[in-house]
A protein has these predicted regions:
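Long, charged/polar, soluble alpha-helical segments
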Residues: 1-192
Length: 192
């Protein structure tokens, strides 16, 4: 998690800027290019969703969508599919409108359960002697640590807990799409 806190509005704008600047880093006609295009499509879709939710006043879904999309973008950069570096999970100001707290709490605990289930529903796909296996291990370990980090914010800071759960869920989902993990459990937990 980044040290500097930002507002939800700043987080959404920063993600939108990063998403608009993103491009694939591999030849489009290649197998890797097809996966890169899928990653970029997910990033673009979630940047658009975040803006739509924000304009409608749905701050909960707006910042969760931006965090999830940023997870996809950062994982895509880490894996070499995208031309980006890794931004990291943003730290958000924890102040939140009282009238949205019930929705925030419900979504935060739902994403905690979903990420927990998603981690249990995958296994590493690549052979253990490959670089891809090392990447899968790194992603799995980092996402697991992210889940633990998010748990430490509960129940006092639902904003940052949801941001963390959403961000690391994006990483795991991107790893599945990139072929680093095979789904052994509930496929509905992934966008595959």
């Amino acid at each position: 998690m980044n040290d500097k806190e930002m507002s939800i509005e700043e987080q959404i704008k920063a993600f939108e800027t990063a998403a608009n600047a993103a491009a694939t880093a591999v030849p489009k006609e290649s197998i890797l290019g097809k996966t890169a295009a899928e990653i970029l499509e997910m990033v673009s879709s979630y940047a658009s969703d975040a803006q739509v939710f924000y304009r409608k006043g749905d701050l909960v879904n707006a910042f969760a969508a931006a965090a999830y999309g940023l997870g996809w973008l950062d994982c895509g950069g880490y894996l070499g599919y995208m031309n980006t570096g890794i931004s990291g999970c943003p730290a958000l100001e924890s102040a939140f409108p009282a009238e949205l707290m019930e929705k925030l709490e419900e979504k935060t605990y739902r994403y905690q359960r979903m990420l927990t289930g998603a981690l249990k529903a995958v296994s590493k796909a690549p052979d253990k002697e490959t670089v891809a296996a090392a990447a899968a291990s790194e992603i799995f370990g980092t996402v697991t640590s992210g889940l633990t980090d998010g748990d430490t914010f509960l129940p006092k800071d639902m904003v940052n807990a949801l941001c963390i759960f959403s961000y690391w869920y994006g990483w795991l989902d991107c790893g599945v799409r990139a072929g680093l993990f095979v789904i052994t459990g509930d496929r509905h937990l992934f966008t595959i």
